[in-house]
Amino acid sequence: MAHYRASVEEAEALVLELLRQHGASSASAASVARALVEAQLQGKPNVGLAHLPAYLDSLKEGRADGQSEPVLETPAPAVLRVDARQNFPQLAFDLACDAFVSAAQNCGIAVLSICNGYTSGELGYYVRRLTDHGLVGLGMTNAGPALMAASGGTTPVFCTNPLAFAVPRKSGPPLVIDQSSSATALVKILKAAESGEAIPEGWALDSNGKPTRDPKEALRGVFLAFGGQRGANLALMVELLAAGVTGANWSVDAPAFNKGERCPGTGVLLIALQPDLLLGADFDERCEAYLTRLAEDHHAHLPGIQRGLQAQERRERGIEVPSELWQRLQELRDLKDEYDLSKLKKQPNPYVSRLK
């Protein structure tokens, strides 16, 4: 596959312009552009530039309100909440970030809830941002409409309900864990459906509640949690925190994020921890020594670190974007005020909720 190498500045400028053309405010567009390019830098293209058409569609069709201004409230010194007002969670996070970080640094721990937003994109982005300030971050979201069954069930009640966790390091990129509660991410089943490949057993059930290895049947049916009941328990925990505590839509009530005019209204819950206030100033040294021991003595994989190193390299030499996608985005920009996505060849949307 041919690729175009774009600088970070070039990619952000293109994404920013497209979002503004489709009705997003400058602030909203800037927040989303930064997040999508960061995902691309991290080697997660399906929630990077390939995800941009879903955002543009959402603006054009009314699922996201790119002009609304999120509302930030601070009901307690270390508790912040933002009503995204059907705008993007990335903007809501940027609005609250400085106060959120300050609260965690002063109080030792702080909580930020975001509700009434469009889908959050790459969850690891939010917790990585916290490590820039020396904070440990934990995040979760009920990312959209129901796709996954509860333990023992055959009907969808949860979305993929990811969790993300990040720890800063004294030197080098942070350790980052970012994974769904489902047996696999939605994008993997979509890729299999596009290529015609079978999926492993244990990933999904068909529309009749039977195990399936057919990815298209999986998309018509229901996803399964990883690890059976244990994964389903985590999905339930995420649902109760990311939707229940924030006041967002439950996944079973969330509208689709790829069709219709209603915002999914999902929620994000983030927790920031200042470790030095609990342990003292030697947390960095203690943590780095432990991670080095795991890697060197036990050959353990340390998630997120290699991605972070690769992101630094890409930031210097440029981001590789499939040429077809880059050309399509350029063509869409040249349409300017026409906003007609139907004039372009559609790429499979990595965030569809069902194949009809």
Regions found by a protein language model. Give the residues of each.
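A generic, well-ordered mixed alpha/beta core segment in the N-terminal half of proteins
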Residues: L80-K170
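Secondary-shell segments that build the walls of catalytic and ion/ligand-binding clefts
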Residues: E194-V252, F257
